[in-house]
A protein has these predicted regions:
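Redox-cofactor-proximal catalytic regions of oxidoreductases
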Residues: 76-104
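Active-site beta-strand->loop segment that positions catalytic residues and contacts the acyl thioester
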Residues: 51, 67
């Protein structure tokens, strides 16, 4: 992307002033190198978002931004319903509530050293993964509705976790306002056999070593030490979330026309928040969030069982679970006025700072854990939300590395077996269902996650706490 079109506010903040139909400016947080590497389509999509009714402050893009459907991935936009604000299915994405949860194992790298292969094999057997993968659960439609209403609370009630898990999950494991009746039967049927599955693409379960600590005091609060082993699970709402997105994108095209909304791009199909369609989508999307929370909770149960088989007595405790494809109602300041806003985060992680009431009590003095996944074979990070992030981008931060090339392009550069062998040579065990999928997710198909995290830290979006190195990766 050409940088000359932006006003450089600081080393890490780039602004494109509002012009034409834009109601607010575009603000991108990135180093100059990351900004230049972004596709021009990111700027175009961020500008289009800035034209939507009721948008507040700016159309934001995170350091890992790349172009997506309608909104850029890594985009953040907040809307005031009382100023004609809209909700957009494209602003949430197809994988509703895709997110990461990280578990502390109580084990160290030295303690698991001789059991890496048995652990990798046991996790591969225990965790259903891959395109169209099915789990060991089959939910009736009435049971599906209960899950969509209760989220991870349903899973815990069914014996797949503990109250402590809920306490350390975003929304305490249950998104209020879910309306299963707004989810199509087709979406529900797609999910009946998919609970407790990873799926494919960039989703994974990864056993990781805490390789480096950047902030000892917060790491101590989070219960992290160098050499510790943690497990991170990255997945979302599977087929149900995708179907909700598909269903409502079609409906919103019609709704936008009916409400006289002039859209700069059809992919930005949206509906006024104060409309029947806006309300219906929010109810369905919240049900999708609950599906993802329940799915990650069941995967946690399966992970605990697998660890217990190899390491009897292992006690895996949840650090945090946070999503990065959502639209949430939150209170934020806009020009000194406290407003109730609908914050779209698409490929962006909520990052509440110290003292925020939504942060679990155990972590409140430190700020919310912000879990950042790298690409396969590269490091991941644990960050903490900051107080200044609220004023920067509505308490939002990055979500991962961000793609540097398409999956199709990646297939022309790498073969799956080659990637698996290369990573094995570095001591990283890969267990996968598809060699094609491994090639599509090759490490160099993504941006440098360390550069992305450094930019987020330097800009004040979130604070670096710990660096995680992969040991075992289970992929679809």
């Amino acid at each position: 992307m050409e940088t000359a079109q932006f006003v450089r506010k600081s080393e890490w903040e780039w602004t494109l002033p509002a012009s034409g139909e834009m109601k607010v400016p575009v603000v991108i947080y990135a180093s100059e190198e990351l900004l230049r590497a972004m596709d021009e389509k990111v700027r175009e999509q961020a500008v289009n978002v800035a034209m939507l009714p009721g948008i507040q402050r700016a159309s934001f893009a995170m350091p890992d931004a790349h172009w997506g459907y309608g909104f850029p991935i890594g985009g953040v936009a907040a809307f005031d319903a009382d100023e004609g604000g809209v909700v957009s299915a494209g602003g949430v994405g197809f994988d509703i509530s895709c997110g990461v949860r990280t578990l502390r194992t109580g084990l160290t790298r030295n303690e698991i050293g001789l059991a890496l292969k048995p652990l990798a094999d046991e996790l591969s057997r225990a965790i259903p993964a891959g395109v169209g993968s099915t789990g060991r659960l089959h939910l009736s439609l009435p049971e599906m509705d209960r899950m969509l209403t209760m989220g991870a609370r349903w899973a815990v009630k069914e014996g797949y976790g503990t109250e402590s898990d809920l306490e350390h999950s975003e929304e305490r494991g249950c998104m209020d306002g879910a309306e299963p009746d707004q989810v199509s039967e087709q979406a529900k049927r797609r999910q009946q056999d998919e609970m407790g599955t990873l799926g494919s693409g960039n989703h994974y379960l990864e056993v990781q070593e805490v390789k480096e600590i950047f902030d000892e005091s917060i790491a101590r609060i989070y219960g992290l030490r160098q050499g510790d082993i943690v497990v991170s699970i990255h997945c979302g709402s599977r087929g149900l979330g995708h179907q909700i997105g598909t269903d409502f994108l079609k409906k919103m095209v019609i709704a936008a026309s009916r409400h006289g909304l002039v859209l700069p791009e059809r992919e930005l199909a949206c509906a006024p928040i104060h409309s029947a369609m806006g309300s219906q989508y929010l109810g369905a999307m919240r049900a999708g969030i609950n599906c993802a929370l329940a799915n990650r909770q069941i995967l946690t149960y399966l992970t605990r069982k697998a660890f217990g088989t190899v390491f009897p007595g292992a006690d895996l405790t949840l650090l945090y679970d946070v999503s990065h494809n959502t639209c949430k109602v939150e209170e934020h300041f806009v020009e000194g006025e406290r407003k109730r806003l609908y914050v779209h985060r698409k490929g962006a992680t909520r990052a509440f700072g110290p003292g925020h009431p939504e942060v679990p009590l155990a972590w409140r003095e430190a700020g919310q854990p912000v879990l950042i996944g790298g690409s396969m074979g590269t490091c991941s990070y644990i960050l903490a939300g900051t107080l200044e992030s609220e004023g920067l981008a509505f308490s939002s931060a990055v979500h991962g590395a961000g793609r540097a090339m398409s999956r199709h392009q990646a297939l022309h550069h790498w073969q799956g077996r080659q990637v698996v062998n290369d990573l094995a040579g570095r001591g990283i065990l890969i267990r996968c269902r598809s060699m094609r999928g491994v090639a599509e997710e090759a490490p160099f198909a993504y941006k440098d996650v360390s550069a992305v995290v450094d930019a987020a830290d330097a800009a004040g979006l979130a604070r670096k706490i710990a660096k995680l190195a992969p040991v075992i990766c289970v992929k679809g």
